[in-house]
Amino acid sequence: SSYVVKPGENDVSTKDVYGGTTRFFSQVMTKRGIEVNFCDLYDEEKLSNLINDKTKLVWFESPSNPGINIFDIEKYAEIVHKSNAYLVADGTFTSPFITRHLEHGVDIVFHSTTKYIGGHSDTLGGVVTTNKEDVWEKLYEYQKTSGGIMSPFDAYLCQRGLYTLGPRLVMHSANAHKLAEYLE
């Protein structure tokens, strides 16, 4: 995100995000001169008030980790897109198999391939997806200059995980549904 956001600009992030994300925003981004505002995304008015001309991205997870909070993605896309900011989601918790963020108005989606996509806890990596041409060009330029490319073996391990992603998540969902019914 520091390639999309420049010093003097700002990010808005929900408070309820993965600890590594919180550390990245509060320790890395702020040292680069980027202001980071954490807020409760359930408060639409507060979110709207935090977004200004310097806001370049609004970051969230839905469901969030660790709180498992669900956000109305389309509503937040509507709020964010009234500005020049991008709506960015970490989709790791549900994978693209369950939550298709881009179809609900999200501009950029991150996934840790270490989790569901890899599926076997034996790879390290991540992917970034977008359907915005201008974002794609910035990300591709950054990838080419920084060398942010997965090793061939890690790519193979992720491909292997993708073969079983659907069946694994169908079973996860069925088990979660049974548990929810039991707890009602």
Predicted regions: what is each one?
Residues 1-184:
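Conserved PLP-enzyme active-site core in the AAT-like
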